[in-house]
Amino acid sequence: MLSPIRTFSPFARSLAARFAWVAVAAILVGPPTRADDSPTPSDKTLGLKPPDGATVLIGDTLDAWSPIGAAAAKAEWPVVRGAATVAKGSIRTKDTFADFQLHVEFNVPYLPDQKGQARGNSGVYLQGIYELQVLDSYGLTLKNNDCGAIYQQIIPSVNACKPPLQWQTYDITFHAARLEGDKVVKKARLTVVQNGLTIIDDKEITPTPGGVPDVKEGGPGPIMLQDHGNLVQFRNVWIKPLAP
């Protein structure tokens, strides 16, 4: 007996076509190569399992997430074999967090016909208000809007990026700002390890534009993943609260 013919939504067909173009471009052109004197990223935390006390944010589903501005709605990014692909609209966690350890694995597309902020752009917003940039910045002299930067604030100390189409890791230790009344008396601080290399080492940060509305500095906040129009993927995202 013949199996019934499956049909797919226009969005699914469009998504498949875009991925096909990325794959063809990668085969025909190939990503750039790393300079010999550049530091070497590692895979030592790729696939790292969540420790005791951690909450899985992206596994097989996006049940922990909702669209921005629609807390009761379901996040609609497609998830295939544990990897979520950016679709229409940024998403945020339903829960909020103060001090934490966050593990994120991401994969940026190969877009050789694009430049700058159009090359695999997304962002991980800590507490919904501090953006850790995601971008194809492989082999570049980094600026404060490149991959691994706290957007428009901190330039990574080293370029730890892998080529596009390879899975990469962020391991983030974050301590929230401290308040006395409504006044911030201690800014938020964080350390970021990208692909096994420390790129930000215990630096103070302030809120960046474009995050979750109505989240205030010093209070608990969600994790937000940004839709910037590129097919960035995320997987194995988990978070573990830390003591103040």
Outline where the language-model segments fall:
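Bacterial N-terminal signal peptides
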Residues: 18-30
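Carbohydrate-interacting regions of secretory-pathway proteins
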Residues: 32-244
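N-terminal secretory signal peptides that target proteins for export/translocation
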Residues: 1-14
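Serine/threonine-rich, low-complexity intrinsically disordered segments
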Residues: 7-9, 29, 35
